[in-house]
Amino acid sequence: MLRLTSLDRQDREAITQHLLRLTPADRRQRFMAMCNDDFIRRYVAGLAPERDLLIGAFDATCLVGLAHLATCPSGGESDITVEVGLSVQADMRRRGLGRQLCASARASATAAGARRMVLHFASANHAMAALTRKLGAAVVVQGCEAVALLDLHRDGPPPAALQQRAGRLVSSFRPLTNINPRASV
């Protein structure tokens, strides 16, 4: 039985261990870059629960899935976009956990007043492409990068304008991993 819950500073070690358990290929898919253990530790140190929302999925023993929501700069307070980073432990995949984490992220982002949710991922990550399309996101692929843009205030297939905006996001892609390694949190 899995338990989804919001995470805070007390969960840093669980987050670190979860991300360290990811294989090099999994880390590349999660962060869109090759990441060593030091990078993971700096990334976790840079997480700020007062700024970011962290949703964790725990089994009986440890954190097996993580959604990280970060607010992106956008057109003002009424035009908030949330970027989501997602990771699921290898042995827990293909069980709907990614979908559950995304649904929880979507509900949390909507409750916080966000208008859109964006997910960047490697175009070779077919599971993420399928998941984001099932959520109703506009997905644009350009080379080895893909971006999914989800309008949080509408249901159904994405309109053409959202698809075009997703295309512009791919062109200006800057991953969520711009975390200051010296930041003290």
PLM feature spans:
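A short beta-loop-alpha structural element at the N-terminal edge
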Residues: 2-14
